[in-house]
UniProtKB/Swiss-Prot annotation:
It catalyses: (2R,3S)-3-isopropylmalate = (2S)-2-isopropylmalate. It holds the Pfam family Aconitase. SUPFAM superfamilies: Aconitase iron-sulfur domain. This is 3-isopropylmalate dehydratase large subunit 2. Belongs to the aconitase/IPM isomerase family. LeuC type 2 subfamily. Its EC number is 4.2.1.33. Its cofactor is [4Fe-4S] cluster. One of its GO terms (biological process) is L-leucine biosynthetic process. It comes from the Bacteria. The gene is leuC2. InterPro entries: Acnase/IPM_dHydase_lsu_aba_1/3, Acoase/IPM_deHydtase_lsu_aba, Aconitase_4Fe-4S_BS, Aconitase_4Fe-4S_dom, HAcnase/IPMdehydase_lsu_prok, Homoacnase/IPMdehydase_lsu, IPM_dehydratase_rel_enz, IPMI_cat. Catalyzes the isomerization between 2-isopropylmalate and 3-isopropylmalate, via the formation of 2-isopropylmaleate. [4Fe-4S] cluster binds at C298, C358, C361. Binds 1 [4Fe-4S] cluster per subunit.
């Protein structure tokens, strides 16, 4: 069996097959300040009085928080009141929250082998832990509140075999952008993307979260890593004991892709699709002027990402024509960055440092683009109008490329600084 089949079989209590429909009880049901209010309204419309499993419900206000306007304040107020009313303890108030997909693994809320649903498409991030995690609609979450179950179709799987080691300043973000360019934005529709091979051990947990996070950008249902010694060490730091989990040798896949980490260059995904990836050495030749650089998000807002950005920015200055916004993914990441002196490096370089928020990624706040403006961002989507005005543009890249570009004022190769 594949990893996806193993986890779903364990939850179903029997062996399952791709294409089969299941009604299962997830371990965690997540929603945020955009998706939770609709789930709450629907729960009440369905006649709900008491949430079936309040201990499995997680509510994280992160998209428009700290509240950017009255409407967003009302959204979070609804979440807050629902949590109190239902005895939901895992409501993360502003000041204690983080970007949801950074926060939940960090807090040990999601663990290896879990079945997780979230009313957010990047819930697939937790596949890095060897959890079957996938995005669902707010009405699915409402259904979970009511009966404690959600329907699933067992996905087919794509196997991605990794070999070699990353070269200097090449990262997990570059790997996943390259993979999406190979698969296409719909190449993994309703399939699990499973990572294997000796190269897996070269990727840290922070890097694995980045890769699994963007599985959805190829249409993937989830992006799964095996549970190995790296996963076990991460979980043990949080007081969680898990066992190794690998796919069976005779597991069946609908497609197989091989990638050599040592052959990768830093990547840049051009507008308006995450699959439009090019080598940064080629992009640099075009001298694409930028107005803004964003380093953060559920894709690249972890401590390793900030360390990499600081490595590039230390002793240098952001171009006077560029706004560089740094967003730690959680309060713990922020505190660690403070402890390591990274925040000083960012401020000395001329960056703005924000409290944890999804803000600019979805064009919500904290970095909305004006007409004609261009951004390079460590986020995960660059669709038309994604970060602001419909006539703005977003290029996706790693923290190293984003930081180098902020310094140069145009999309630049960090290896040449």
């Amino acid at each position: 069996m594949t990893l996806a089949e193993k986890i779903l079989s364990q939850k179903a209590g029997r062996k399952v097959e791709p294409g089969e429909f299941l009604l299962l009880e997830p371990d965690i049901a997540l929603a945020n300040d955009i998706t939770a209010p609709l789930a709450i309204k629907k729960f009440k419309e369905y006649g709900g009085k008491k949430v079936k499993y309040p201990d499995r419900v997680v509510l994280v206000p992160d998209h428009f928080t700290p509240n950017k306007d009255i409407k967003s304040a009302m959204q979070v107020k609804m979440m807050r009141e629902f949590a109190r009313e239902q005895g939901i303890e895992k409501f993360f108030e502003i000041g204690r929250m983080g970007i949801e997909h950074v926060l939940l693994p960090e807090e040990g809320i999601v663990k290896s082998g879990d079945l997780v649903v979230g009313a957010d498409s990047h819930t697939c991030t937790y596949g890095a832990l060897g959890a079957f995690a996938t995005g669902v609609g707010s009405t699915d979450i409402a259904g979970f509140y009511l009966i404690g179950k959600v329907w699933f179709r067992v996905p087919e799987s794509i196997k991605v075999t990794l070999r070699g080691k990353f070269k200097d300043l090449v990262t997990a973000k570059d790997l996943v952008l390259k993979l999406i360019s190979i698969l296409g934005v719909d190449g993994a529709n309703y399939k699990a993307i499973e990572f294997s091979g000796p190269g897996v051990k070269e990727i840290s947990m922070d890097g694995r979260f980045t890769i699994s996070n963007m599985a959805i950008e190829a249409g993937g249902k989830t992006g799964l890593f095996p549970v190995d010694e790296i996963t076990i060490a991460y979980e043990r730091e949080r007081g969680i004991e898990v066992e190794e989990m690998y796919p069976d040798e005779d597991a069946k896949y609908v497609r197989e892709v091989e990638m050599d980490l040592s052959e990768l260059e830093p990547q840049v995904a051009y507008p308006f699709l995450p699959s439009n990836a090019k080598d940064v050495s080629e992009a640099e030749k075009e001298r694409i002027k930028i107005d803004q650089a964003v380093i953060g998000s559920c894709t690249n807002g972890r401590i390793e990402d900030l360390r990499l950005a600081a490595q590039i920015l230390k002793g240098r200055t952001v171009s006077p024509d560029v706004r560089c916004i740094i967003i730690p993914g959680s309060q713990k990441v922020y505190k660690q960055a403070l402890k390591e002196g990274l925040i000083d490096i960012f401020i000395d370089a001329g960056c703005a440092v924000s409290t944890p928020t999804c803000g600019p990624c979805l064009g919500g706040h904290m970095g909305v683009l004006a007409e004609g403006e261009v951004a390079i961002s460590t986020t995960n989507r660059n669709f038309v109008g994604r970060m602001g005005h419909p006539n703005s543009k977003v290029f996706l890249a790693s923290p190293a490329v984003a930081a180098a570009s902020a310094i140069k004022g145009y999309i630049a190769d960090p290896r040449k600084l």
